[in-house]
Design a protein with these regions (language model features):
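N-terminal soluble domains immediately following signal/targeting peptides that reside
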Residues: 1-135
Length: 135
């Protein structure tokens, strides 16, 4: 089966947009064109990804980064590495990947990703995950 993710709520942060990347394991793409930096918090509440309108950097020491399937095992001592020069970045976030539970009677599961800006404080992008068996 596959996990289908959807966004149910996006915070009202000027310049922020989020879309789900549909795939066998869903991902999320954020685009940010706001005036002040925006930080995505990781699964442990740590600073994970920083967005400005012209750059995206990731914290290679973040447990969320280390858990990504496509991250390199070799990291330098530098904590923040530039990943994009566009203000947009997509990744396979573990919060969008539920265990493949064939008992779908539980209904959709919820997910949330915290984002923070100096002006707005911490807010959440929230959504639902639904397991869909493939016949």
């Amino acid at each position: 089966g596959i996990v289908k993710a959807r966004i149910a709520h996006q915070p009202d942060i000027p310049g922020l947009s989020a879309i789900i990347l549909d795939a066998p394991r869903p991902g999320i793409l954020l685009r940010y064109q706001g005036e002040e930096p925006l930080t995505v918090l990781g699964t442990d509440g740590e600073a994970f990804i920083r967005f400005t309108r012209t750059e995206v950097t990731v914290n290679t020491e973040s447990p969320s980064w280390k858990a990504l399937p496509n991250q390199s095992a070799e990291t330098s001592q530098t904590s923040w590495v530039t990943m994009s020069q566009s203000g947009a970045f997509g990744w396979l976030d573990s919060r969008l990947n539920v265990l493949h539970d064939s008992n779908s009677a539980d209904g959709p599961k919820t997910w949330s990703i915290a984002v923070t800006t100096p002006k707005n404080g911490t807010e959440r992008i929230e959504g639902q995950l639904t397991y869909m068996p493939i016949h």
